Amino acid sequence: MEDLQLVLFVLGAIAIVAVLVHGFWSIRKQQPRTIKEQPRTPYAMSPGRRDAEGFDADGIGEVRVRKLAPDDKKSEPVKASHDDTFSLSDEPKVRRVKERQEPVLESRADAAPNHAAHERRGHDFRHHEEPSPSARQVQLGLLDDLDQEPSQGELYEEINASVADYDDDYDAYENQPASVDRAEAARVPADQGQAAHSAATQAEPQAKAEEPLPDPRDVLVLHVVAREGQVLAGAELLPCLLELNFKYGDMEIFHRHEDNAGNGKVLFSLANMLKPGTFDPDTMEQFNTHGIVLFMTLPCHGEAVMNFSLMLNSACQLADDLDALVLDGQRQLWSDATKAQYLARIRANA
């Protein structure tokens, strides 16, 4: 009996060992090959990534390994040697630089006209023209007269008195002969002819320099004043001036130039009606005044009638935007009779 148990124990042990061996063999068979046993083929070198000629998408071919022949010898390093001999073949190749041609200097007699022409061209592109000494004196004199500005109460008393006399002045204006209207109507074709002539002159390749203006003989003045009990606020005044193409410039006041961008000659100017008559754009938000004054000297650049019309339209536009009144140079209400007087003064100084 004991022999039978021993035999069964041995057979069971052999069966267990056989099962274990078979299990390890099955696991080893199903396990993939290790990395060392697998061929290392890069992703770019796979057959699916290359064309028929062996080039990949970037145009790079397969890497070729060249075996070193047994008789190949390593290249010996070049030994530095000092040689005092010099040959033309040893010269480094120098890139030829094209010689710069120096400008030929002109004589003083020939360069003077060209220098004057350059000064004229540069003068045309200046944003702010320096006024002539005589015109500057007129502007300074006008600003000095601001010291004698009446108080607001006296100003409105003059306005009320002018309203009472307005009807009489208007009747007298209507009774005037029609010669003024005929002369103004006859002047329109002449103005158009002069405008066409000026345009043709600008089209010429070499335009003559403008002649300097003579000394001012007259000054046309317009006032824009606030209504009684009100003031003109700088926060509202500055946008209106910029919209009307006024540019802040010389003498710390605003100017209207020939070009809307602020280029060219000054046509007329705008100053504060109260002392000292200047503006400060940095403090316009806190600025208040009872009125402003627009003035134009005669003779002026361009057409005086057109310049005056532009100044009058600017004054009326400011009065409409700021709810103000337009007065003449004598601080009277603006009327058609006053306009006729101003036109007569323009024709007298033409």
Swiss-Prot record:
Pfam families: ZipA_C (PF04354). Residues 28-350 are cytoplasmic. It comes from the Bacteria. It is a single-pass type I membrane protein. Residues 1-6 are periplasmic. Essential cell division protein that stabilizes the FtsZ protofilaments by cross-linking them and that serves as a cytoplasmic membrane anchor for the Z ring. Also required for the recruitment to the septal ring of downstream cell division proteins. Keywords: Cell cycle, Cell division, Cell inner membrane, Cell membrane, Membrane, Transmembrane, Transmembrane helix. Interacts with FtsZ via their C-terminal domains. One of its GO terms (biological process) is division septum assembly. This is Cell division protein ZipA. InterPro entries: Cell_div_ZipA, ZipA_FtsZ-bd_C, ZipA_FtsZ-bd_C_sf. Belongs to the ZipA family. Gene3D superfamilies: ZipA, C-terminal FtsZ-binding domain (3.30.1400.10). Residues 65-109, 116-131 have a biased composition (Basic and acidic residues). It is found in: Cell inner membrane. The chain crosses the membrane at residues 7-27. The gene is zipA. Residues 36-55, 65-136, 187-213 are annotated as: Disordered.
